[in-house]
Curated annotation (Swiss-Prot):
One of its GO terms (biological process) is biotin biosynthetic process. PROSITE patterns: RADICAL_SAM. This is Biotin synthase. Its EC number is 2.8.1.6. [2Fe-2S] cluster binds at C105, C137, C197, R269. Catalyzes the conversion of dethiobiotin (DTB) to biotin by the insertion of a sulfur atom into dethiobiotin via a radical-based mechanism. It comes from Prochlorococcus marinus (strain MIT 9215). Pathway: Cofactor biosynthesis; biotin biosynthesis; biotin from 7,8-diaminononanoate: step 2/2. Binds 1 [4Fe-4S] cluster. The cluster is coordinated with 3 cysteines and an exchangeable S-adenosyl-L-methionine.
Length: 335
């Protein structure tokens, strides 16, 4: 590897090139894991953030993302749902907090935020979640500068807007929104003073070069995204990518480790597809730098490890987390 470990530890960079990233991504696995854990332990406490994700409005999205069952272009049989009421969402957030989550993420299957009753309700939800003492994150598509400012005023902690894949591979995945649209949205979020949550998906038919290119875009953002969700494709029947093969867990470990090396202080979130990983693979991801997970039985329209299995896993690993949930019997799936 061109950079020694000492060089990697000296500074946080925002000028990575694709060749450097590919070299890291393709390192012998044991060396890669050692590099990433060394950096992780230097910059971060050894704990795991528990983030609960709730689909506030499900289905009917106007985008044609080929991996997504919520798209109007998908033939998937999902249960669409109109926007939940503010009180229902805050009740869900309250139970998530009691179960141990300290971030509550809310998702809307929209192309973009539109002013009006639904947006006003979103602002109430954000404010209500913050009043519970939790971090609040929203993912709802594109937004304007004014909307970003109003979300900031409501107390929004972070806005999620993933890049999905590399600029080069992007056109093979979605055509109803450009890569630049995504970057512009992220800029508006950042200009409003809201933390950026931005990551991608592996298993979309991309090459290793595409993965390096995606990580280049993310790691050259200054500052780095506050949190970086790394997802593996959950191939859903009826979507354009329903026949894609599952990725090997080693590929996820490599992606997590490389992201940690490139973005030492970001929360690297082990996200969709985690249910397919063995307990041992998840532990290796934590060792390599993953320090956040989505917590609860469902991620929008895909399944997730159960509350009980995550509680057991975290205890076995010995990481620190919010222990308020240990005496609770009600689970997120009981709502």
């Amino acid at each position: 590897m061109a950079n020694s470990n000492n060089q990697l530890l000296k500074e946080i960079r925002f000028d990575w090139n694709k060749e450097e990233i590919l070299e890291i991504l393709n390192m012998p696995l044991i060396d890669l894991m050692w590099e990433s854990q060394t950096i992780h332990r230097k910059f971060n406490k050894y704990d795991i953030q528990l983030a609960s994700l709730f689909s506030v409005k499900t289905g009917g999205c106007e985008e044609n993302c080929s991996y997504c069952s919520q798209s109007i272009y998908s033939a998937s049989e999902i249960k669409s749902h109109p926007q939940f009421q503010v009180e229902e969402v805050l009740a869900r957030a309250q139970i998530a907090k009691k179960e141990g989550a300290d971030r509550f993420c809310m998702g809307w299957a929209w192309r973009e935020i539109r002013d009006g009753k639904s947006f006003n309700a979103m602002l109430e939800m954000v404010s209500g979640v913050r009043d519970l003492g939790m971090e609040a994150c929203v993912t709802a598509g594109m937004l304007t500068e004014e909307q970003a400012a109003r979300l900031a005023d409501a107390g929004l902690t972070a806005y999620n807007h993933n890049l999905d894949t590399s600029p080069e591979h992007y056109k093979n995945i979605i055509t109803t929104r450009t890569y630049q649209d995504r970057l512009d949205t992220i800029k508006r979020v950042r200009n409003a003073g809201i933390n950026v949550c931005c990551g991608g998906i592996i298993g979309l038919g991309e090459t290793n070069g595409d993965r390096a290119s995606l990580l280049k875009v993310l790691s050259n953002m200054n500052p780095h995204p506050e949190s970086v969700p790394i997802n593996s494709l959950v191939a859903i029947e009826g979507t354009g990518l329903e026949d894609n093969q599952e990725i090997d867990s080693i590929e996820m470990i490599r992606m997590i480790a490389t992201a940690r090396i490139l973005m030492p202080k970001s929360k690297i979130r082990l996200s969709a597809g985690r249910e397919k990983l063995s307990k041992e693979a998840q532990i290796l991801c934590f060792q390599c730098g993953a320090n956040s997970i989505f917590y609860g039985d469902e991620l929008l329209t895909t399944s997730n490890p159960s509350f009980q299995s995550d509680r057991k896993l975290l205890k076995e690993v010995g990481v620190s987390f919010n222990k308020d949930f240990e005496t609770r019997e009600k689970t997120l799936s009981s709502l």
